[in-house]
Amino acid sequence: MRAIIFSSLFPLVVLVLSGLSQAADVDPIFTPKADVVFPETVSVTYRQPVKMRDGVALSTHTYLPAAEGSFPALLVRDIYGNGSQPLRQRYARFATQNGYAFVYQVARGRYDSEGEWYPYVHETNDGEDTLDWIAAQPWSNGKVGMFGTSYLASVQWLAALSGHPALKAIAPAMSPGNYYRDVAYPGGAFSLLSRASWGIGLVGSRTNGSFPIDWISGIQHLPLKTLDESLGFRVQHFRDWLEHPSYDAYWEPLNLEARAPEMAVPALNIGGWYDVFLRSTIGSFSTMRKEAASDDARRGQRLVLGPWPHGWNASTTTGEVDFGDRSLINDEVMMLEWFDHYLKGQPLAKRAPVLLFVMGRNEWREEQEWPLARTVYQDWYLHANGTLSPEPPEADSGRLSYLYDPADPVPTLGGNIMRPELRGAFDQAPLDSRDDILRFLSKPLAEAMEITGPVSLRLFAATDGLDTDYMAKLIVVKATGEAYNLVDGVIRARYRNGFTTPQLLKPGEVYEYEIDRGATSYELAPGDRLRIDITSSNFPRLNRNPNTGAAFAETVEMRVARQSVFASKVHPSRVILPIIPKASTPANAP
């Protein structure tokens, strides 16, 4: 294992290998970013119409180094138009300064590109046609890399599906990979705030970066199927998402993790512990490493996980927690190493496949795999007296109950969400007065404990309704009293047996649910405690389950549900924690 130790005075790091440290070993990806400037002369072509196979022209900007000859190209395909201009200019300076052509293209149906925009569906063909165009240019040497974040990352994977030989490597940051699970329906519940503000909002801002709507109040509207019209638009893709609440043929083409065998491109996968697409970032890395179409692609997968929300590496603060200067990396150095190898044939820096940030300890660490091979999975049990411990319950019975009222849902406070004002780690104290949250608290830890890996919950519960939701949140309670969310998850009860065939409940019957709560890396300090919060709403992040069994997008009726959570020898509700043994070494460590 190569630990990365940070200076207490400067945002630099010294690598420690075999017990030795030297200033000469400072890793360049942890040094501050340098200013980038255009070379003295650079050739720029703005808004060139590049024709796709169906005749639709996409607005394309090209920046070329002043030197004679042909160059590898870095491509960004964007949907945010003029709002991306400052970043586009920095990308262009960075690329041309380092001997790359830079191509920036506005996606179909956005801003000054022709056609109609429907999220994701045109990006494979349009990406392939754009790669064709780049490879045919006299300034191109036929080698292309792609990079970008969020939708700008999605288009990279979708272009990779084309199998275009010019696409040599990609660097997707915070990209969805399973669009049903991570974009629209996590745990089967509709991702309301993100899908409404993004899916409807972008239509309203095709040519205007501002879209003045109070989303928090606006999405109170019912029925959800007419939410778009209530905001002044009719948005077909938003309606299609609502019309396909189960995983079906609509979503299958957009499960890119399942399509890994169709792709043969090395990828630098970048994610954040508080990013809405964290599971996809990890899933893409894992499936491509096992199932990609070529050995080069399987070996060429890298994973970087920092303490970031969506829109990575922009601030040291995530929610209410400041992780310090050490939490930022020099992404330009990292990208340059990556593309210089795959597009210019230079040696790739010797790095482990996984680089992750351990929160709490606030240290970067290299690992050989994900999940870590040395992980010890521990069951921590919920007890009827409100405690949480590694000891299983001894009583044959144990039940705790609460009322879930969809008209008075638990408000969203932190987590893996897009909205800047809500995402990240927050002290959960503002929710302490609510009686519709069950809380299970551990004793203070006697020694430090690291949790790194996927977290899940096995929950035994019953309701008096035909359908409902269960939410689970893993929280670290600091010795000073603050209670910060680490990971959370949801299961819509009708999808307890899978997301293809919903099954309503029998009121009063006890069911076992598995709640996937994503992943984290956090070291708890001595005196810290773990807490599990169980409830049935997280609004407006997720739509409110009306508890009626009706189609959620069509109904306006809601009912109060009585929820029961079981914690006993017969019904051992528990969280499964990935514990990293102290002073252990990773498998296959260099």
Which residues does each PLM region occupy?
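Accessory cap/linker subdomain of secreted extracellular hydrolases
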Residues: Q97, L158-E262
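Short beta-strand/loop motif that positions the catalytic acidic residue
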Residues: M263, N269-G271
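N-terminal cap/lid segment of alpha/beta-hydrolase-fold proteins
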Residues: P32-A67, L441-E447
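Active-site-adjacent alpha-helix of alpha/beta-hydrolase-fold enzymes
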Residues: R279-Q301
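Glycine/threonine-rich phosphate-binding loop and adjacent beta-strand/alpha-helix elements that clamp
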Residues: A24-P32, Q48-P49, D296-A297, V321-G324, ...
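Glycine-rich nucleophile elbow surrounding the catalytic serine of serine-hydrolase chemistry
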Residues: T149-L158
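Alpha/beta-hydrolase fold nucleophile elbow
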Residues: P138-S150
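Cap/lid segment of the alpha/beta-hydrolase catalytic domain
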Residues: P65-A136, A184-P186, A314-F323, L466, ...
